[in-house]
Amino acid sequence: VTAELSSIIDFIRYGASRFSAAGLTFGHSHDNPIDEATHLVLAALHLPPDLPPAYGAGKLVAEERERVLGLIERRVSERVPVAYLVGEAWFAGLKFKSDRRALVPRSPIAELIESGFAPWLDHRHVERALDLCTGSGCIGIAMAEYNPDWQVDIVDISPEALSLARENIVFQHVEDRVEAIQSDLFAGLAGRRYDLIVSNPPYVTEDEYAALPGEYSHEPKLGLTSGEDGLDLCLRMLDEAADYLTDDGLLIVEVGESERALAKLLPEVPFVWIEFKVGAMGVFALERRDLIEHAKAIRAAAQARR
């Protein structure tokens, strides 16, 4: 069958058919087999994602055919995410290096970045921002790209993830505005305060992790799980964040499917669950003053995990 394939669009169609027939999971950057196959084929050929349709008729040479077919086969047989196969992923319209040192870039927070965090920052002045649990660095670097007057710190406990994040800082040419810091949450940030703290921390429960499709087994578990209910790290963050926020500071955190568990655990805390184009995505916003007002309940919940 593959001998009959010749054009770029042929290989995209073939890849999409193989992915669909194999029942692959599309949770890393794409949600369907056609976009997944398009990403794989174009990246493997070193072509841009917005390639004009006319180029789809272009023919692959023998070496390119072999490379693309090999990647399609690995995507199916090994369940490796496309971003890892081709070494790149897109987030908030920006290209990032991606490999097994950190999770594949993905978060609804990209939509917030692209919209200027409207309406959350409409009446706030931001000079310093923090991306906590940065992984590949995608959130913090994207914040700096979209807001050239911000200074952004990106933090992770994993030296492997930070090495990738530092490569992405250079890749996006934001060395003068983004600093990568290895730290267990706020431990290495003494004396620093931020107008905005954004985080996509690990929040997958142990039961959820055990049931995840094979694609997720290629990602570092440290970046996915956080205790039995997925909230261990989030609670520590809530307990400590006020000390690192400016007086009018804002905290935005993604907790995904752990949203209900968090709301149930801290019912008196006025989490504002942000609505995205596709609806709620388990991302909350919380003012520093609310963290202070409910500090006792938050600390009790956090200390119960220690």
Q: PLM features: residue spans?
A:
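N-terminal auxiliary segments of SAM/dcSAM-dependent transferases
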Residues: 2-92
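Alpha-helix termini
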Residues: 22-27, 116-124, 245
